[in-house]
Amino acid sequence: MKRKHKRLLFVLASFCAAGCALLFILSELRESVSFFYTTSELLSGPQRESNLPVRVGGMVVKGSIARSTDSISFDLTDFKTELNVVYSGMLPPLFGEGVGAVVKGRLLHGKFVADEVLAKHDEKYMPKKYTIPKALPEPK
């Protein structure tokens, strides 16, 4: 082979290797990206019919948390539609009424059966020892 052909072959092999590496990186990133649907998107979209696991995000409706012996149910809303969620397991400490949550699971017979519940938190979190009291006590 001529030197020119060897160089061309090396450049082509380098491009193929770089393309394969890029394809691998993008496929791994796609699996780790964590987006979610709103309750309206889930209930009106094609995801409603599929039995594939999806993530749904919204706010926990106040007064909707009901605990039974083996599960917890609550309603999740995007302020347009509500979705009833059933979960068996430990809830995160930040979970509560009026708090943002993301649930992962499947929609079965109008109820969302969650495998995982994540509570969103305020980005302005500050530990208790650093917080300033809202009102100082009256001196006696």
Curated annotation (Swiss-Prot):
Sequence ranges on the Cytoplasmic membrane side: 1-7
Keywords per UniProt: Cell inner membrane, Cell membrane, Cytochrome c-type biogenesis, Heme, Iron, Membrane, Metal-binding, Signal-anchor, Transmembrane, Transmembrane helix
GO molecular function terms listed in the Swiss-Prot or TrEMBL record: heme binding; metal ion binding
GO cellular component assignments: plasma membrane
GO biological process, one term: cytochrome complex assembly
NCBIfam families, sorted: PRK13254.1-1
Family: Belongs to the CcmE/CycJ family.
Protein name: Cytochrome c-type biogenesis protein CcmE
